[in-house]
Amino acid sequence: MSYFDKLPKGVKIRSFFVSSAGFFLDGYDLSVISFAIYFIEHEMGLSSVETGLVTASSLIGMIFGAILFGWLSDKVGRSRIMGIDLIFFAVFGITSALSQNFIQLFISRLLLGVGIGGDYPVSSTLIAEFSPSISRWRYLTGSVSMYWVGTLVSALITLLTLPLGAYYWRWVFLFGALISIPIILIRIRLIESPRWLVSKGVLKDSNLPKQEDENKGIKGYLDLFKGNVLLVTLFVSLVWFLFDVASYGIGLYYPLILREFAFPSNYEVLYGTMVIGIGAIIGYIIAEFLIDSLGRRVVLLFGLGAMSLLLILGGIVKIFGFILVPYFMTFVALEQWAGAVTLFYPTELFPTSVRSSGQGFATSISRIGAVLGVFYFPIMVKDLGFSTSLIVFGITCVIAFIFSILMAKETKRKTLEETSVGLKRS
């Protein structure tokens, strides 16, 4: 048992809570647009291109936020950045609610995305560094499952505010901004990660790992693209990119898919979307108990394999109607197995000195995939049809599955010193 495994339980729970709260807000703010865009499009008279840009704007912002805040987290510390990124949630959530035209809304959602993107590497790195090695994945999976709780809450708030009329979406955006404020106040009181302090030579003790054991010979950002670390960077970025093409390409359109191919009523669409979200939470609960026993590699391969099979079969049989709800509920449940591993693999494979930077880079690349999926899905549905589009996304999952077979490393029940990769082969 390492020194970090012996940290007080209260510290671990506090870090888990503040990280989970970040993922909750991520899920809320990213998901809320998927239903609201239908009303925004009509209110502002958006063109199809403008509608696509508004829908994808937060994902575009995440590309830049993940790299920036991931790098800053390695430079100045995890705790200092955790409060700053949520300021973006509060400020630009409010400006989104007050937007009067396409430009204002696009810029507001883009800058909101910068904060969301920044929270991914910082929150995931922090929870990984505070969690005990024997049950690290339960902490990690439990925290990211809050993303789908945020998604469910966004649907619930939409349901409650929908009677207000076409302007309801402004209140939904405002709610997301307001709930971020108390979380900011809690985060600014969080202690710094001991691992980060060791990596900087600030914290030294005979019971602690040596500074060189934490850093593995890596000194800066560019070392992510050298030697053995380059292979890790390529693996986590490429697989996550391919996963997000399908995950976000379909996921942000669940309400629109249900409206187009299943239900005519807005309320039926909302209920269907909430059922799908419950499926995701069930998937995370199952994954939480399996990943530390079966291992990351097995769960990742099973998740990607199930996604591939379901998407391709769904396209072949041309699935439609109310059956889409249990179909997508099953899909997202198994999708979370792969999703949890792709999200947290970088935190175990990169050493402390560039853990947040590596996570930020991988997040950024994954969001490029998400933007491509979100942008091209409606185009593919129009030109190729819904069923063929499912098959195309299924193929991206097959490619991710193949790369994972070749490159996925098992890290279960090992300390971060054991799982992280340095410039030289250990």
Feature map (PLM): residue ranges:
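Transmembrane-helix signature of 12-pass secondary carriers
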Residues: 1-426
